[in-house]
Design a protein with these regions (language model features):
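Glycan-recognition and catalytic cores of secretory/periplasmic carbohydrate-active enzymes
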Residues: 1-191
Length: 191
């Protein structure tokens, strides 16, 4: 599935956005449930990570630099210079400084359709999700190594190099002797 979880349903029919907070929280919940054995949600979590979550992170800012400069976003007027505290606000290299942040309300095909801005909660929660994703790619215990998510990961036991979605190949380079098991997603044929 895509991993698009709308933040508002019903009250604003033309508003179709998913906060990175929503997507991050849903991924973390799926990982925690799968990790604890309360359900097999590995496929869902990996699908949501690959499809919508990675696209929520701002890595390419060239499109922002091409936008016409605006002094205000509708509904968010710029404060008068007399109330700007330069200890907390600046307009110096803002685009360069927001690389790595997350979309506050993205649609499946638009990074910012309704609100062109950054919110601290989305960036914080999404980075917390990256931690849980990273931790759950591999699980090591007592000489046994389990690959749960077919995503790239380096560790002292093994490196996982995923070529998905470009090819159906995942390489695991073993660095220490381990009993290796790899969880096969439901979409992998048994033949």
């Amino acid at each position: 599935t895509l991993g698009f979880f709308p933040e508002i349903i019903g009250t604003l029919p033309d508003y179709r956005g998913a906060e990175a907070c929503n997507v991050a929280g849903t991924i973390i919940t799926a990982l925690k449930l799968a990790e604890s054995g309360m359900g097999d949600y590995w496929d869902e979590a990996e699908s949501w990570v690959r499809n919508h979550f990675v696209e929520l992170q701002l890595l390419d800012t060239t499109w922002i630099q091409r936008l016409p400069m605006r002094h205000a976003i509708m509904g968010f007027p710029m404060p008068h210079r007399s109330v700007i505290d330069e200890r907390y606000m600046c307009n110096d290299r803002v685009v360069d400084r927001i690389i790595g942040s997350f979309a506050p309300s993205a649609c499946p095909n638009d990074w910012a359709r309704h609100f062109l801005g950054i919110t601290g909660c989305c960036t914080g929660n999404a980075n917390r999700a990256w931690y849980h994703i990273w931790q759950n790619i591999l699980y090591h215990d007592g000489g046994k190594l389990q690959v749960n998510l077919l995503l790239n990961r380096s560790s002292k036991w093994a490196d996982v190099d995923s070529h998905i979605p470009y090819t159906g190949q995942v390489d695991v380079k073993i660095k220490e002797p381990v009993d290796l098991s790899i969880r096969m997603p439901q979409w992998v044929s048994s033949s």
